[in-house]
Regions:
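Nucleotide/phosphate-binding catalytic cleft detector across ATP-hydrolyzing
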Residues: 1-165, 173-250
Length: 250
């Protein structure tokens, strides 16, 4: 059942949406086109009037560089809606990038949600999608979606284990017969790794780097076990002793 749904054989005009947390991205999938949008789930807004200054990639590039009158907002926390209005504005902007007239105008929308999401958190997502014009909204637990994406058994009486490391949370789950049998999550994930890199460089190399640089370090040379060969990377930041820009290689 779920595999048919995600392959979009049983619906006509559909979109699939994965709302990433914090600095991870929101993905939108369109039938026949694949992934049509991949943008960081971030907004930059005015502190006083709440006016949107930047969304997605442009907002992410402002991390650590915003003036006092602008603040970077992460409307999604731990995989669910933390700021309803900001999330609605962000999703509306994302949809406007792929659909004319800035509305969904009829598509059926599949949205991934954490398996631990409450009824209130799920309703918030449905309300946002309905406001944008989706004629039907289907929420699917993210572990089930991940199993389908990995082409593992989902409808059969077989267990599949999946570990999903996101931006704000990491979730491990066992799925079977179109559902989640058991799942556990911790609030340690990609963002926590970035902060650990920032702290390490500050304490061991007297260098302050921003979140974007920390993320690049994690992606380029981060590993979960001792590497077979030493990877090196040059990184730029601010020398905490002099206050001037500095570059080191690790």
């Amino acid at each position: 059942m779920f595999r048919d749904f995600f392959s979009f054989r049983i619906f006509g005009d559909n979109l699939g949406m994965d709302l990433g947390t914090s600095t991870s991205s929101t993905l939108i999938y369109a039938k026949g086109k694949g992934i049509v949008l991949n943008m960081p789930s971030i907004l930059a807004v005015g502190r006083k009037d709440g006016r949107i200054v930047a969304v997605g990639k442009e907002a992410k590039e402002m991390l650590g560089k915003t003036p006092q009158n602008i603040v970077v907002v992460r409307p999604l926390q731990n995989g669910v809606v933390a700021d309803y209005d900001a999330t609605q504005k962000m999703v509306e902007y994302f949809v406007s990038q792929i659909q004319p007239y800035h509305r969904l105008i009829g598509p059926k929308l599949v949205i991934g949600v954490p398996s631990r999401a409450t009824k209130v958190e799920k309703k918030a997502l449905v309300d946002i999608a309905t406001h944008l014009g989706a004629r039907q909204v289907q929420l699917v637990h993210e572990p089930v979606a991940a199993v389908i994406g990995a082409n593992l058994p989902v409808s059969e009486p077989l267990g599949s284990m999946i570990v999903d490391i996101g931006g704000g949370t990491s979730e491990a789950a066992i799925t079977s017969l179109d559902g989640v049998v058991i799942s556990k999550h911790i609030r340690i994930a990609g963002d926590e790794m970035d902060q650990a890199i920032i702290l390490y460089l500050k304490e061991n190399h007297n260098l302050f780097v921003g979140e974007q640089m920390a993320e690049r370090i994690k992606i380029n040379i981060g590993c979960t076990h001792p590497p077979s060969r030493n990877e090196k990377m040059k990184m730029r930041g601010r020398d905490l002793s002099t206050g001037f820009p500095n570059e080191i290689e690790i």
